Amino acid sequence: MGPLRVFTDNKVKVMLLNPIGGAGFNDFVVETVLNHKDPSTHVTITSLANRIGGNQTLAYPSIRPLLYGEMIRVCLQARKENYDVLIINCFGDPMVDELQQIAGDDMVILGARQVAVQTASKISSKYAVLLPYDMKSSPDPLHQRVVADTRTAVAHPVVDMAFNDDLTPMDGESLGERLATQGKLAIKENGAEVLVLGCTAMVGCWQGLMRAVGVPVIDPTVAALRAAGKAGRLKRELVGGASTKRSGTFPTEKELKMIAESEPSYPFSGRIEI
């Protein structure tokens, strides 16, 4: 993992977590982070420990819970390192609600889908979400949540993505063509005025797609990076203000400390400082 970087300025500290085991996807998003992060932020790109079984664990509902304990430990590690914002870089927004409770007032949790849909809704109520595969008929709870949370979309076109082992797209050029085809149909047939990329593996496609279709395109990773600076600054200004913890039962600080201290530091499979 390498030594932790010591920040000596007052920039907002943002951790972008790719919730998969394996560092390959981290390299895939570096260029986007470099080009589109808020200038007032330091961004750390991370991925979960290799011990969860690799990149594909996220794809299978039966073993996906392996991620959840790891994500809790990442959240506690980020709190320990005084990060202002933790971005969950997956359009499924796994564990976003739970991590908000754990982070409390110490850190803002941003889900990529959450920010992307909010951004699209500010531009127009007529937005379409370009999905990597058919989620509407999927029994997967994470897919059902994506569809439910984007139910105000005018359409959910499917682009039939194929993935490499590290979850990057197999054919970027072909993907761009399918995105343009489905985006144009959503505009023509459903009246979409904004398109939202429905998978963070579509990162880097938004500008070409926007040129092809002529309407705004929201990349969830870019939207979250741009929102992180503002959210982090606001968090610093309002520290000690209203708690972000939800009503209901949540662990005490003592219990969270026991989890955090179960290992010296979290063994990220990859960590890139930008």
Swiss-Prot record:
The record marks 90 as: Seems to be responsible for recognition and proton retrieval of D-isomers. It holds the Pfam family Asp_Glu_race. Disruption phenotype: Abolishes the production of both oxepinamide F and oxepinamide E and leads to the accumulation of protuboxepin K. Keywords: Isomerase. Gene3D superfamilies: 3.40.50.12500. Belongs to the HyuE racemase family. This is Epimerase opaE. It comes from Aspergillus ustus.
